[in-house]
């Protein structure tokens, strides 16, 4: 592969690799603590974007003749001049090369015809690409962006006669370096192949045709919207015309966590209530972070879609709550008779049965996390040293103090192991009692194996068993072989209790069931086409690419636009469900028809 492509294709992230676990822990701790003293978004508050007078259009002639400059008006980046506009939404994309490139290749195509149960659906490439967060894994650096996002997207659309615009919001993985790399990559006017970035902040507003608006907020690490960002959107909210329709993008689908954490949705609810308020109708909310497709809908047609299938490992769909009622803390004071909306789960991809079946992959995939066996070997060796070298309860009656003293080291070690394994459940949205129960089970699984090994050694050679280093060596060897399997057994069982499900599926690193959204805005409203790919394809560098650019301008353009990689087999995109049509609501009235799936 030539060095001119300027990036190195990456394998999917293996989340249980010890070195990576340490690095992520350090990054999370530093970024969280650093954010308490300095929020990089505060620096964006003073950034003055070039603006046109209210109501004017950002066009070629108005931007100093620079064809690829986009001016931000008081209503946002202005795309209102088109009668019809297509957009693409991709989230959680920057992971393994094959999966990311598969999605990038579909987004790059000028058109897609999607087969569905009711026939085919023709779609056009988005003039705008919105990236919904987590553009690089495991954490953002310029190198990771180059290898895991820029390279794959640029290789599928190196150049085009009709360049497109790209906007992005950061997810938690983009925030792990304090947003420094994100600002460099997306807020400095860089090109990513045929896509041009133009935003100056980590959040943005797009003014779309027919009084539709796409607002994308940056909720940082702690689901927080800073005051400068609130002022930015408040200014745009005041410029809205009557009958405005809002599509809201956020990096986290907070509504899915509302049952376990009643405060999870507070920030987005506050934004909706105070910034959007009665000035506009919130019709659709988009989020990533969870790596699947899931659509929620209320009786009045408002929809919330999770579409985090841009390239990262598959997340489980079988634990999604339904219905969800995102709590509104101050609603009872403002409008006592009004109750929170109920959002019912309409469709998931993959189906819940398939999601459950895929968790069995953990028993083989656990061993693909290189170096993880070192962790289990070290733990087993330490526990084996603490296990008594004889059968404590076979000692003569009356020597109970000796028995207690013999059991003290292994007891303390077991308590330490339990504490560590309980901390391992911290990211799960389960009750503390359930977490303690599964942590105890996890501890018992490992202790049972180690005690069994020491007991076997006692049967073979009491002299060898008396040597703590001999026990440590044997325990470490068994830990390397069986320790990962015991972790896999634990993760499989814990998922049934909705604990450590994310860790289970992250360890599987399953690249199947990718997805993205294609949106069309026209006079009839907004139509969402959810695009799915059950299996990403493998890619090989195209050795037949001509190395010298032709002199003719037309031929040079065709030469520059050729993809650098070829798939080893055809990509098979499909429509996950019938297109979701959201008609516009009339000011102070009702929609012409409710949000529904349409045949195309």
Residue ranges and their predicted role:
Residues 90-91, 128-134, 162-172, 217, ...:
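Active-site neighborhood of phospho(di)ester-bond hydrolases with catalytic His/Asp-centered motifs
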Residues 84-95, 211-221, 247-251, 302-310, ...:
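Active-site-proximal beta-strand elements of phosphoester/diester hydrolases
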Residues 245-247, 257-262, 270-271, 303-305, ...:
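Membrane-proximal envelope and lipid/glycan-remodeling enzymes
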Residues 168, 263-328, 481-514:
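Conserved beta-sheet core of the metallophosphoesterase superfamily
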Residues 98, 227-229, 241-283, 366-370:
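Active-site-proximal segments of metal-dependent phosphoesterases and phosphodiesterases across multiple
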Residues 96-98, 137-140, 170-179, 222-225, ...:
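Active-site environment of divalent metal-dependent phosphoester hydrolases
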Residues 1-130, 136-170, 176-210, 326-600:
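Acidic, histidine-bearing metal-coordination/catalytic regions of metal-dependent phosphoesterases
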Residues 187-191, 201-204, 209, 217, ...:
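Preference for well-ordered, secondary-structure-rich cores of eukaryotic proteins
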């Amino acid at each position: 592969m030539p060095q001119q492509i300027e990036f190195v294709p990456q394998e999917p992230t293996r989340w249980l690799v010890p070195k990576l676990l340490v690095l992520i822990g350090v990054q999370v701790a530093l970024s969280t603590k650093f954010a308490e003293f300095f929020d990089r978004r505060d620096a964006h508050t003073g950034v003055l974007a070039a603006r046109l007078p209210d109501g004017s259009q950002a066009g070629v002639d108005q931007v100093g003749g620079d064809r690829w400059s986009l001016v931000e008006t008081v209503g946002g980046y202005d795309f209102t001049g088109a009668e019809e506009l297509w957009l693409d939404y991709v989230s959680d994309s920057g992971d393994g090369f094959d999966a990311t490139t598969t999605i990038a290749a579909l987004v790059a195509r000028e058109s897609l015809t999607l087969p569905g149960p009711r026939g085919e659906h023709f779609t056009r490439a988005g003039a705008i690409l919105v990236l919904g967060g987590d553009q690089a894994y495991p954490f953002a650096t310029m190198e990771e962006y180059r290898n895991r996002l820029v390279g794959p997207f640029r290789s599928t659309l190196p150049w085009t006669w009709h360049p497109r615009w790209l906007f992005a919001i950061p997810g938690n993985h983009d925030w792990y370096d304090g947003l420094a790399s994100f600002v460099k990559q997306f807020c400095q006017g860089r090109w990513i192949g045929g896509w041009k970035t133009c935003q100056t902040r980590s959040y943005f507003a797009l003014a779309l045709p027919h009084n539709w608006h796409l607002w994308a907020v940056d909720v940082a690490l702690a689901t927080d919207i800073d005051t400068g960002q609130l002022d930015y959107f408040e200014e745009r909210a005041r410029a809205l015309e009557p009958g405005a329709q809002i599509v809201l993008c956020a990096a986290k689908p907070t509504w899915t966590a509302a049952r376990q954490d009643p405060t999870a949705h507070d920030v987005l609810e506050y934004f909706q209530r105070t910034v959007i308020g009665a000035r506009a109708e919130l019709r659709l909310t988009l989020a990533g972070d969870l790596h699947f497709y899931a659509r929620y809908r209320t009786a009045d047609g408002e929809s919330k879609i999770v579409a985090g299938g841009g390239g990262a490992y598959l997340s489980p769909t079988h634990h999604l709550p339904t219905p969800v009622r995102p709590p509104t803390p101050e609603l009872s004071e403002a409008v006592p008779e009004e109750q929170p909306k109920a959002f019912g789960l309409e469709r998931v991809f993959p189906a819940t049965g398939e999601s459950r079946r895929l968790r069995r992959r953990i028993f083989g995939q656990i061993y693909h996390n290189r170096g993880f066996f070192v962790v289990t070997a070290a733990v087993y060796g330490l526990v084996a040293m603490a296990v008594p070298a004889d059968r404590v309860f076979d000692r003569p009656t009356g020597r109970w103090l000796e028995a207690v003293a013999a059991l003290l080291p292994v007891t303390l070690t077991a308590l330490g192991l339990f504490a560590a394994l309980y901390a391992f459940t911290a990211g799960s949205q389960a009750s503390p009692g359930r977490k303690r129960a599964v942590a105890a089970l996890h501890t018992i699984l490992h202790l049972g194996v180690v005690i069994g090994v020491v007991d076997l050694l006692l049967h073979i050679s009491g002299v060898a068993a008396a040597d703590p280093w001999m026990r440590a060596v044997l325990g470490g060897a068994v830990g390397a072989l069986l320790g990962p399997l015991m972790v896999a057994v634990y993760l499989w069982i814990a998922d049934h209790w909705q604990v450590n499900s994310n860790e289970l599926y992250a360890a599987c690193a399953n690249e199947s069931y990718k997805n993205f959204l294609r949106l069309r805005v026209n006079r009839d409203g907004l139509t969402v086409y959810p695009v799915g790919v059950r299996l990403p394809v493998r890619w090989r560098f195209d050795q037949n690419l001509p190395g010298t650019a032709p002199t003719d301008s037309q031929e040079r353009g065709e030469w520059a636009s050729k993809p650098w990689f070829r798939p080893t087999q055809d990509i098979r995109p499909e429509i996950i469900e019938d297109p979701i049509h959201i008609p516009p609501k009339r000011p102070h009235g009702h929609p012409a028809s409710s949000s529904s799936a349409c045949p195309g």
